[in-house]
Amino acid sequence: MYRGTASSTAATEVGTVRDVTITTDPQKAPTTTRGTAGTPPVETEGVVSIKWSCDWTMVNDTSDASLTAFRTAAAAGSPIALRLKDYSAGKGFDGDVTLSCKEGQPLAGEQTFDFTATPTKKSGRAPLVYS
């Protein structure tokens, strides 16, 4: 995972994330047409948009610059650049995102932050789901 300033490709590696989940969910609409000569139609559908999100967890560490950047962006509703790769030279998401944040404060154990990123075009850059 890489982070950066919105409207540019993220270049700062974030090595302190864990439990990353990427969700790609094609949104569909019906495309069924009438059958002919007494033949019932077969229901069909087509993709009209793609819903994408990324969830990850970070352990609270006040010296972690990436955690601070993510928390600041989430609190302000400001977009940031996010780049994900399936391996070091691989492909993945590249675009600007907005973040939501949940803070876990367990009675026992470590304090964590759970982030969810969703794409935005607010900074003028179209998201690429797998590039």
Task: Tell where the protein language model's regions lie, with residue ranges.
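Short acidic, glycine-rich loop/turn motifs
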Residues: 2-8, 84-89, 119
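Solvent-exposed edge beta-strands and adjacent loop segments
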Residues: 1-57, 94-114
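Beta-strand elements of well-folded, non-transmembrane domains
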Residues: 26, 58-62, 86-88, 101-105, ...
